Design a protein with these regions (language model features):
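Generic detector of ordered secondary-structure context
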Residues: 61, 302, 349, 393, ...
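Conserved P-loop NTPase motor core
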Residues: 1-582, 631-632, 653
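A short, cysteine/histidine-rich metal-binding "knuckle" motif
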Residues: 831-837, 842-855
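A generic alpha-helix preference that emphasizes hydrophobic side chains
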Residues: 4, 66, 171, 354, ...
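Short, Lys/Glu-rich amphipathic helical modules
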Residues: 448-462, 639-640, 692-696, 840
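Active-site-adjacent structural elements in folded domains
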Residues: 110, 438, 824-826, 834
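Extended, charged helical/alpha-beta scaffold domains that provide interaction surfaces
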Residues: 326-334, 340-347, 549-550, 557, ...
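Hydrophobic, well-ordered secondary-structure elements that form the walls
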Residues: 454, 502, 744, 780, ...
């Protein structure tokens, strides 16, 4: 702690002092609340709503409202909020992040600000990390709100849009971050206002805010549909990838060295950079690919797909590992969430990586998907008028929360002092020695009936340890992605005396591990970490499973110099130093230098990851501004506003811009290229061809005026063809929605391509982000021009035959996060026609050159 903190206290301590008087007022109201009957306590809700309507603010009501919830908690659940929980509630109401240690009852804390903010009637979302917690909390904590007369809803993955709409219409809604984000994206793809499920985004309380930020900070939410690409190329590239030789890693050759011209001899066909998870072809590798595909130059634009796919195949073989990153089950590749160790059914890697892994594992390669809508969690949560977060570990990331969400983190003291002992890390030379030591430690604890929880990073490691324990005859349970149905039970039993539980990264959070008396006597829950995780937060989470509410406990991490963390980020010097010391086998190395090296490796990785997320966010910011514009326009169309004026403006804009494109301000009348003007304008607005004979005045502005008037008359004539004026208004909305959606989906794809290409700009001494922004804005302008042209073209060429129906541009086939997997999709009855198939109309042409063109 530095001098300034000693004198003035930390940021959290100063803020807690400021809140102190509020907490006192809530506590002083306790006796008067206890005297109220149930009916009188319930009547408080209506009284508060009335006071709000008469001009009081939520802050005015806070002490009394919190006191009411506190009393209701005691009556309904027999749980009265502790003082520290009241503090947490105030922090959350203020739109900040409350850091509370595991087992301090975060779930109960959220009832306070949720009740207070729900009084406005605008809705409150309590966001959890999985369906199980959302359902549990809604049923459990929901009792308090229902007792006080508020409605409580829960949104689960299996629900229909009707059920979701009803849940979101409640005063308080429990929902997972994925469901909420996807519902927002889906709401921006609906074609009738009645199909919307969400209300405006008012106030969100995000549970485990750090895990939403981390886990998904670098993977945005994606809704996808199928693209028409063939899957053969993946299988061919997989065959080639197996024949290619991996070269020596160019570990120390950084980009800086590359720019400074430091050279090292390349070896092999490709080089893998494990730190940044990148694969690059060497010159020899490029030659091999060209020879295999019989092409002259791999870098040619028409070969970009081959280049992309061979890199994917090499990544699948060298950076993606079975039973660590994914599992193969029932002829399917399923992703394993690296942070929780859970399988995520229905989620797929994007950009073709999933197909490359399918080819590697010889299972059926599914068609590639096309992104229809996407958003990052950070940008999504920033759309709420107010947001707050709860977590057990956020201070390590406080800078990030300030930078990205503009929220500060307040550390809330524990209700009882922590009695857990966190021991120094034990370091061994090799992995084998480390595992041997872990088994010995488990054996020793088991002999004295002390419960043990062993945390591993991969499924493989958990199974290996399980085999070693079985050999020693130690009964135990394993919890990893393969068995996650039993999760809650296994976690709940982990505190029984003599229990040994092995878990991958399990957070398994949300379920408390309760000790029995014998276990408490034996020293409480012993936590063993089998290696340090890249993120200190996950290490702290594992530690925090023990010692809740003042329980005894201990934690210790076992590390070997061969662990990934030490191998990739530890220093070579350190390792060689211990090698020269000649340490005997199975000897534990304890050294301050080692502990520091581990801490600094973790800090290095964290700042690296923060950089990646911040970078992603800066790129997404460009998309975000564009998304806002498109979604706002879409919403206006949905809200049933008349688009008549907008359409007329489009018609006049197009006319003006086409004249401007062909005729310069000082071009002589004789030099006007009318043929060019007709070829640009008439396909969109079918006027009579512009010839010199029918131009009223040989002035550019006069020509613009004349053509605009003709175009407007043309549209008025089209309007007159419709017997009911509302019919053409609806047609305008239908066409606009269709065009906006189709163009926006293509634009998302183009922007993704642009972003991947932006990295190459770095070598051209240009800032990739600046290039991306400039090009992105140009592409957006081009897209809006195309939307105008396509809309006007469609409206002016439409024939009045039957009532128009709105329809979705693309069918959603899936999402990229587990809980939101679309369950059984509706199968199409007729076979899908691909662009190169013969046209079903019988003309003998390819579909894309016949009916496909019209489609």
């Amino acid at each position: 702690m530095n001098v300034i903190q000693k004198v003035f206290g930390t940021h959290s301590e100063r803020e807690l002092k400021r809140i102190e008087p509020l907490v006192k007022r809530i506590e002083e109201l306790r006796p008067s609340m206890q005297q109220l009957s149930d009916a009188e306590l319930k009547a408080k809700t209506e009284e508060f709503k009335k006071r709000l309507s008469e001009g009081e603010t939520l802050d005015d009501l806070l002490p009394e409202a919190f006191a009411v919830v506190r009393e209701a908690g005691k009556r309904v659940l027999n749980m009265e909020h502790f003082r520290v929980q009241l503090i947490g509630g105030i922090i959350l109401h203020q739109g900040r992040i409350a850091e509370m240690k595991t087992g301090e009852g975060k779930t109960l804390v959220s009832t306070l600000p949720a009740y207070l903010n729900a009084l406005e009637g605008k809705g409150v979302h309590i966001v959890t990390v999985n369906d199980y917690l959302a359902k549990r909390d809604a049923e459990w904590m929901g009792e308090i709100h229902k007792f006080l007369g508020l409605t409580v809803g829960v949104v689960l993955n299996s629900m229909t849009p009707e059920e979701r709409r009803a849940a979101y219409a409640c005063d308080i809604t429990y929902v997972t971050n994925n469901e909420l984000g996807f519902d927002y994206l889906r709401d921006n793809m609906v074609i009738y206002k009645e199909q919307l499920v969400l209300r405006d985004l008012n106030y969100a309380i995000i549970d485990e805010v750090d895990s939403v930020d981390r886990k998904s900070g670098s993977t945005p939410l994606i809704i996808s549909g199928q693209s028409g690409k063939s899957t053969k190329l993946y299988e061919i590239c997989d065959i080639l990838a197996r024949q290619m030789q991996r070269g020596e890693d160019m570990e120390d050759l950084s980009k800086m060295d590359a720019i400074m011209g430091v050279e090292r001899e390349e070896t092999g066909d490709f080089i893998v950079n494990e730190k940044d998870k990148i694969v690059n072809l060497t010159a020899q590798g490029v030659e091999k690919v060209e020879k295999f595909f019989q092409i002259d130059n791999l870098a040619d634009p028409e070969n970009i797909e081959i280049q992309h796919n061979i890199i994917l195949a090499l990544r699948a073989h060298n950076l993606m590992f079975r039973d660590q990153d994914y599992v193969v089950k029932d002829d399917e590749v399923l992703i394993v969430d690296e942070f929780t160790g859970r399988i995520m059914p229905g989620r797929r890697y994007s950009d073709g990586l999933h197909q490359a892994i399918e080819a590697k594992e010889h299972v059926k390669v599914k068609r590639e998907s096309k992104t229809l809508a996407t958003i990052t969690f950070q940008n999504f949560f920033n759309k709420f008028d107010k947001k707050a977060g709860m977590t057990g570990t956020a201070l390590t990331e406080e800078k990030e929360f300030r930078d990205i969400y503009g929220m500060d983190v307040i550390e809330i003291p524990t209700n009882r002092p922590i009695a857990r002992k966190d021991l120094q890390d034990a370091v061994y030379k090799t992995r084998k020695e480390k595992l041997h030591a872990i088994v010995e430690a488990v054996k020793e604890a088991h002999a004295k009936q002390q419960p043990v929880l062993v945390g591993t990073i991969t499924i493989e490691a958990s199974e290996e340890l399980s085999r070693m324990l079985s050999k020693q005859g130690i009964p135990h349970k394993v919890l990893n992605a393969k068995f996650h149905e039993l999760e809650a039970e296994i976690v709940a039993d982990a505190g029984v005396h003599g229990a040994v539980t092995i878990a991958t990264n399990m957070a398994g959070r949300g379920t408390d591990i309760k000790l029995d008396d014998v276990a408490r006597e034996a020293g409480g829950l012993k936590i063993i970490g089998t290696e340090r995780h890249e993120s200190r937060r996950i290490d702290n989470q594992l530690r925090g499973r023990s010692g809740r509410q003042g329980d005894p406990g201990e934690s210790k991490f076992y590390i070997s110099l061969e662990d990934d963390l030490m191998r990739l980020f530890g220093s070579e010097r350190l390792i060689s130093m211990f090698n020269t010391l000649g340490i005997p086998e199975n000897q534990e190395i304890e050294h301050k230098m080692l502990t520091n090296a581990i801490e600094s490796a973790q800090k290095k990785i964290e700042s690296n990851n923060f950089g990646i997320r911040k970078n992603l966010l800066e790129y997404d910011q460009v998309m975000n501004e564009q998304r806002e514009i498109i979604y706002k326009e879409r919403r206006q169309v949905l809200d049933g506003e008349s688009m008549r004026d907008a359409i007329y403006k489009m018609i006049t804009d197009i006319t003006e811009s086409k004249v401007d494109m062909v005729i310069g301000d000082d071009t002589d009348y004789d030099d006007w290229d009318l043929e060019e003007l007709n070829s640009l304008l008439l396909p969109i607005i079918p006027l009579a061809p512009v010839k010199r004979g029918r131009i009223n005045k040989p002035k550019k502005n006069a020509l613009k005026q004349q053509l605009k008037e003709e175009a407007v008359k043309l549209y008025e004539a089209k309007e007159a063809e419709f017997p009911e004026p509302e019919a053409i208004r609806e047609l305008e909305r239908v066409i606009l929605l269709k065009v906006i959606d189709r163009k926006w989906m293509d634009h998302i794809d183009d922007m993704e391509q642009l972003r991947q290409g932006a990295g190459l700009q770095a070598y051209g001494q240009r800032d990739p982000l600046v290039e991306y922004k400039m090009n992105g804005y140009e592409m957006f302008d081009e897209m809006t021009e195309n939307i105008k042209e396509d809309t006007v073209r469609a409206l002016l060429h439409v024939r009045v035959e039957q009532k128009v129906e709105r329809e979705q541009v693309a069918k959603v086939t899936g999402t990229n996060k587990d809980e939101s997997a679309v369950k059984a999709p509706v199968k199409r009855m007729d076979a899908k026609i691909y662009p190169n198939d013969p046209c079903p109309c019988g003309s003998g042409k390819k579909y894309k050159q016949c009916c496909g063109r019209k489609a």
